[in-house]
Amino acid sequence: MTRVLRVIGQLSERDRGLYLRWSLSKDSARALRETWILITHAGGTTVSIAAVALPLWLRPWDRSVTWVAAASLAISHLAVQVIKRFVGRPRPSKPIGIDHPDRFSFPSGHATSSLAVTLAYAVAFPHFAVPLVGFGLLVGWSRVALGVHYPGDVLAGQVIASATVLGVSLIG
C-alpha cells in the first residue's frame, strides 16, 4: 500500500509540474486568453447538450447516431460526477478568465463531455473524425491552459469518454 501511495504522490507532483508549465498566466496575451476561453465554452454543458438535442429534433441523419452520442454524454457525465465526489481532488488555484464550475478537479467534465460527443459523431462520420476528435481534445487542453484542471484530470476525462463511447457503440 505504501508503494501505491508513493506512486500516486509522484504522479500528482508530475501532474502539478506539467500544469505549471502549460497553463497561461495573467500576463499572457489577451487574444490568447480569449481564444482559450472561447474554446472552453464551446465544449461546455450548453453546447454539448445542444449537439445531441438539435440533431434529435431536426433529424439530419439516422437518430441512432445521435442516441449513441446522447447516451455517451449522459453515462460519461454520471461517471465523472461519481468519481469527482469519490476522489475529491481540489482544483488548481489560479484560473485565468473563467470561474470554477465546482470545487472538484478530477476528472475534467469539459474534457469528458466534449470528447464523448465528438468521438461518438466521429465513429458515425469517419470523414469528419479528425476535426471532430481534434476539437474534443482541444477543449480538454483549454482547461489546462486556463488553469482550471491539471493535465491528469483532462486525460482521465478523455479516457472515460473514450471508454463510454466504445461501450455504448458496442451495445448499440
Predicted regions and their residues:
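Multi-pass membrane proteins that catalyze or facilitate reactions on polyprenyl-/lipid-phosphate substrates
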Residues: 1-13, 61, 65-68, 133, ...
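N-terminal transmembrane-helix/juxtamembrane module of multi-pass inner/ER membrane proteins
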Residues: 1-47, 80-101
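Membrane-helix interface segments
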Residues: 29-32, 61-66, 92-93, 126-131, ...
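Transmembrane alpha-helical core positions of polytopic small-molecule transporters
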Residues: 44-46, 73, 111
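Interfacial segments of alpha-helical transmembrane regions
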Residues: 51-78
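Membrane-water interface at transmembrane helix exits
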Residues: 56, 80-88, 122, 169-172
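Small-polar-interrupted transmembrane alpha-helices in polytopic inner-membrane proteins
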Residues: 70-86, 130-141
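Membrane-embedded catalytic cores of phosphoryl/pyrophosphoryl-handling enzymes
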Residues: 96-172
